Amino acid sequence: MSSDNSKQDKQIEKTAAQKISKFGSFVAGGLAACIAVTVTNPIELIKIRMQLQGEMSASAAKVYKNPIQGMAVIFKNEGIKGLQKGLNAAYIYQIGLNGSRLGFYEPIRSSLNQLFFPDQEPHKVQSVGVNVFSGAASGIIGAVIGSPLFLVKTRLQSYSEFIKIGEQTHYTGVWNGLVTIFKTEGVKGLFRGIDAAILRTGAGSSVQLPIYNTAKNILVKNDLMKDGPALHLTASTISGLGVAVVMNPWDVILTRIYNQKGDLYKGPIDCLVKTVRIEGVTALYKGFAAQVFRIAPHTIMCLTFMEQTMKLVYSIESRVLGHN
């Protein structure tokens, strides 16, 4: 009995630490994501180039064979700076995307739980349907906000003076990329591939936090682990693998749509059909090793740091706004 009460107290304490404003949630989520992307940006870079190589060709030579070999090739030709291409765009994008995806998930979930389960405490309800919808909804918000930045980031990271993969577009930086796209392609150009971005991010977000929270609850309820960094690490690892499997096909599609400037693809479904028809179904999992190599540590760091940034922001809000 005392063991059950102890578990309940821990859950209540944890929930209280994350009971912050929507703006605070956005800030905490964005901050956690920026810390993570600093480490994982080089892996994102090689993932993009692996996804683009062999585009619309089943027999093209593979310059980048795996993430480690690929990063070694980039380092040899472009140096450390080359491995961190697009980092500034990645920071701004992460604030928009993950600030929304990580920050708005709990407020949306809580509101829906209050609506559908009025007789229960919202933070104690674990409805798969509500969790998945909340994850997808918060992800879609982030995808819309961050789409122009992801577009510029993709083009910055795919460009290389040494090994040309896919369509090459040279921008001097984030602002130059945004201005150039606006001048040449208009507002529509800035939101090129927004439908693919929504599919990609919605798919990944629909499983990221639901898997994370479900894994934590199962591990704690069955006395397999106690709440703390080890639990957060384990649950986020499981979540990262789930995200990689679900998101990779749409990630390939989005990368290709973002990188092309013409009308090679009419939309995400057209790109999906052409990719499978010409390169085979396995093309949808191009760069999967890099995806796992990136998304697993990125998710681990994002979700683990989010636990801490949520508590940090909550403590600041408590002092400034007088939260209980």
UniProtKB/Swiss-Prot annotation:
* Domain of life (superkingdom): Eukaryota
The entry's localization annotation reads:
Mitochondrion inner membrane
Keyword Transmembrane helix recorded: yes
* Record's protein name: Mitochondrial oxaloacetate transport protein
GO MF annotation terms: isopropylmalate transmembrane transporter activity; malonate(1-) transmembrane transporter activity; oxaloacetate transmembrane transporter activity; sulfate transmembrane transporter activity; transmembrane transporter activity
Task: Provide the species name.
Answer: Saccharomyces cerevisiae (strain ATCC 204508 / S288c) (Baker's yeast)
Any one of the GO BP annotations:
isopropylmalate transport
Q: Which reaction(s) does the protein catalyse, per the Swiss-Prot or TrEMBL entry?
A: a dicarboxylate(in) + sulfate(out) = a dicarboxylate(out) + sulfate(in); (2S)-2-isopropylmalate(in) + sulfate(out) = (2S)-2-isopropylmalate(out) + sulfate(in); (2R,3S)-3-isopropylmalate(in) + sulfate(out) = (2R,3S)-3-isopropylmalate(out) + sulfate(in); malonate(in) + sulfate(out) = malonate(out) + sulfate(in)
Q: Which GO terms describe its cellular component?
A: mitochondrial inner membrane; mitochondrion
Instruction: Report the protein's function.
Output: Antiporter that exchanges dicarboxylates and sulfur oxoanions across the inner membrane of mitochondria. Exports alpha-isopropylmalate from mitochondrial matrix to the cytosol, where it serves as a precursor for leucine biosynthesis.
PANTHER family recorded: RE38146P (PTHR45928:SF1)
- Disruption effect? Auxotrophy due to deficient leucine biosynthesis.
Q: Where are the transmembrane segments?
A: 26-46, 79-99, 132-152, 193-213, 233-253, 284-305
- Annotated keywords: Membrane, Mitochondrion, Mitochondrion inner membrane, Repeat, Transmembrane, Transmembrane helix, Transport
- What is the activity regulation comment for this entry? Inhibited by alpha-keto isocaproate, an intermediate of leucine biosynthesis pathway.
The note filed under miscellaneous reads: Present with 5350 molecules/cell in log phase SD medium.
